[in-house]
């Protein structure tokens, strides 16, 4: 039906007769002439109808936005004064000789100026996806997956599919369950990841595996989370953690080079402990120059319990955050920041405004100045490298609250004061995570997942002091987003059972949930390691949007609903009966 795409016409096509298929993006009726911007997947081109082709001109008068049409015409160069530098096709236009209206469009539920609520965009997603910026994002996503496949093929990885209907295993979030008709009362789980299957593939001798795969997690959603999401899943045998990171870093550098024309360079490596200490986060945004600085040793003897208490507590921390130029912040702005950090458990926000450093105590403005002598103030200013016009914020509490609160404040202030270099790319690896973290109920939970290997520990050493164990795990972070994470896996049955035991999984439960894995570990399991990237998040970064729903064709809302299809929906009672399921209705309040 077509000979060319609208968005691909250039000066090289001048004089050629072309047939185009697409939609009316905009129509301008000048009486004797009608112009339309005609759109398809590749872009927009201007088409005009003149009186010399009366039939086509008459039919063109009926055109409205989003009519689906076919146009045949001749490509012409625009007059120099009419060239549109903002359009890829802006040097040419098409003089139409024939027009076919393939399908008309009703009045549109979306605003033609594209000022629409997200609810409307999701309900009429098929119209929203016609917008050039949305089409471009999905084309970029397709390019990314194509580049990934070629790279992985070139590096000896095999694309192997793993099951969608599998067994529920504890991986940190709730499972989506699928009832079995054949085995009434039993359920499959949709996979949160192919974790165990890819490990079993390594035990099967496939050496290098990858898969671009859907995963499912029934969890409370945030702006950058979806109940179903896509992973670039990778596993290798006989490779160390640095070797895995080297290959995966090469993949990501390749993507940025091909999609953005950007050389990311070598990725720095930072331990979890250093990231938390310097940036208050295990996914630091290195485009932001501000760092947290420990000052507890300077404040142990001050007569101000807010500082002295945490400074003398082994589990406490007092840290400072210097904000370049922050002395210009108003009292209201400071109060707003104080309220902001309360979200993260902080009780308040102490600060020092540095107006004239050379004057010592007289050169600062601070509500806590009365508790500090000149020597302490000078030491704080030295350690934070404060200059005239700077602001120093303080966090004083337990270590987690200080890291969370000042880490979040660092990001917010960086954006508010334009201190974060938005034009920069800042990738890094974060390694050496704690193996376990407190579950809040006196026990331990795996920081990554229970199949992660500890670093340089025997099973006996791990069992003796699990709270001090470091995991052989690594995350890739770009501009403050965790885009991928992985680890060296446990390849010893004894070690795996030890980890299960530390997590409070007794032997009976181990057999019930992981018997197949424990059995497989008995038969010559190779050392193996892997990683998974979030394709949605990678695409989000590479397309420059901050909304993950912009890079998924048919996403869910934050309530895990599809507004277009109205999923989830009630099931047919007959289908439920066949599955042996009764739906219990909530009692209405009297």
Curated annotation (Swiss-Prot):
Record family assignment: Belongs to the class-II aminoacyl-tRNA synthetase family. Type 1 subfamily.
Primary role: Catalyzes the attachment of L-aspartate to tRNA(Asp) in a two-step reaction: L-aspartate is first activated by ATP to form Asp-AMP and then transferred to the acceptor end of tRNA(Asp).
Catalytic activity: tRNA(Asp) + L-aspartate + ATP = L-aspartyl-tRNA(Asp) + AMP + diphosphate
Subunit note: Homodimer.
InterPro entries: Aa-tRNA-synt_II (IPR004364), aa-tRNA-synth_II (IPR006195), aa-tRNA-synth_II/BPL/LPL (IPR045864), Asp-tRNA-ligase_1 (IPR004524), Asp-tRNA-ligase_1_N (IPR047089), Asp/Asn-tRNA-synth_IIb (IPR002312), AspRS_core (IPR047090), GAD-like_sf (IPR004115)
Region annotation (Aspartate) ranges: 195-198
Superkingdom of the source species: Bacteria
MF terms in GO: aspartate-tRNA ligase activity; ATP binding; nucleic acid binding
Ligase listed as a keyword: yes
Binding site for L-aspartate: 171, 217, 448, 489
Residue positions binding ATP: 217-219, 226, 482, 534-537
One annotated Gene Ontology cellular component of this protein: cytoplasm
Keywords noted in UniProt: Aminoacyl-tRNA synthetase, ATP-binding, Cytoplasm, Ligase, Nucleotide-binding, Protein biosynthesis
GO biological process terms on file: aspartyl-tRNA aminoacylation
UniProt EC number: 6.1.1.12
Key word Protein biosynthesis present: yes
Protein name: Aspartate--tRNA ligase
Location within or outside the cell: Cytoplasm
